[in-house]
Amino acid sequence: MKTKSLFPLFITVLFFCTSSCKKDEKTDNIETEFKGDIIIVGAGASGLSAAKKLQENGISYQILEASDKLGGRIQKNIDFADFPIDLGAEWIHADKSILNYLINQQGNEPDVETILYQPTNVQSVSGDTITQIPEQDMIDYYSNYIIEYKFKNTTWYDFIYENFTENIEENIIYESKVTTIDYSGDKVILTTNNGLEYQADKVIVTVSVGVLKSNVITFIPSLSTEKINAIQDVEFLPGFKLLMKFSEQFYPDVISYETNSGEKSYYDVAYGKNSQDHVLGLLSVGSSAEEYYLLGDSNAILQNVLQELDGYYNGLASQSFLGNYIYMNWGQQTFTHGTWTSDIQASSNNLNESLNNKVYFAGETYNTYGVLPVNGSFILRGSVQSAILSGYKVVEEILF
């Protein structure tokens, strides 16, 4: 089935915020009798939010992170342009007040500066034809369907680092790829790729569902058929970002495409930023990404993209390209194996269920919140806030 990407979104999230973000049970400190040790696998958004909640409640924990840095699919670059660029998650996918909710801060106005993201200079591609979408159609679209924000002079990585790493980073053990999780005994024993063993009373697995689908972690006992099927039924598509710097802006705010699965969009990365640079991004996920992969390496993909843009804009892409580009291929990253959760066919009960109340799962895939009880935000799987809230929720499950 073909899908239409009106502008680059990691996932569409509707938001109906009419009140201030207040404290609620999802982020309040929890009284508990649990005094054991916990190991978190993965230092992405959900792993760090789980760690923050454990730390607030005085629970001993460690984080095993496979890579040499924290953040998971939330990363940034500060050298490519005159503003910081999100290499992974980029859009907030909700009203800006969700940022306060995530850190248990009252009020609708976050401390960080944001951009109301409503591009109106949008072109659409169908087959070989590119057409301009009427500005009023885009205005009506934003009025009727979606509120979207981005960070102005910062990134998702900055938000995560500033709010979820204080006194936590010292508990992260980097370059520790978990290969085996043995939950057959009283303690859960984890083995890493360097042969080290760690044990804990409980384990929270926050690796991407793409990693689980790839079977790079061995569970002892083996996962049930129901659990395996639930994981394999999650749609977790490959994809990449290609960021290119030009001497002039010859392109609109957004170029959207029809795709068989996932999405494909070009977008002005500098939209609303305090920038003198001209940076165009290509977000390609699903079927379009797989077609690009067939071309070969990043340079082959770049040349194909420039040729495509030249066809739309009379050769201006190649003429104004400065030679600088970033290719962030999340679909083939060793520790992610994909982009984000776009669809789930399986029962969320099988997907979210712990293993013998010893091994728990958290991340953007496992969100079960729906509409938040306080500010009316509708949180779908696949967003950063889904990952953060999942980390909070799994700690509640353990401590209660």
Predicted feature locations:
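N-terminal FAD cofactor-binding segment of flavoenzymes
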Residues: 92-120
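Helical element adjacent to the flavin cofactor pocket in flavoenzyme catalytic cores
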Residues: 145-189, 198-201
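Conserved flavin/dinucleotide-binding core of flavoenzymes
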Residues: 46-49, 135-142, 187, 264, ...
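Bacterial Sec-dependent N-terminal signal peptides
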Residues: 13-38
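Glycine-rich FAD pyrophosphate-binding loop
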Residues: 55-80
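Glycine-rich loop(s) and the adjacent beta-strand/alpha-helix scaffold that form part
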Residues: 208-251
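Short hydrophobic core segments
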Residues: 39-41, 64, 198-212
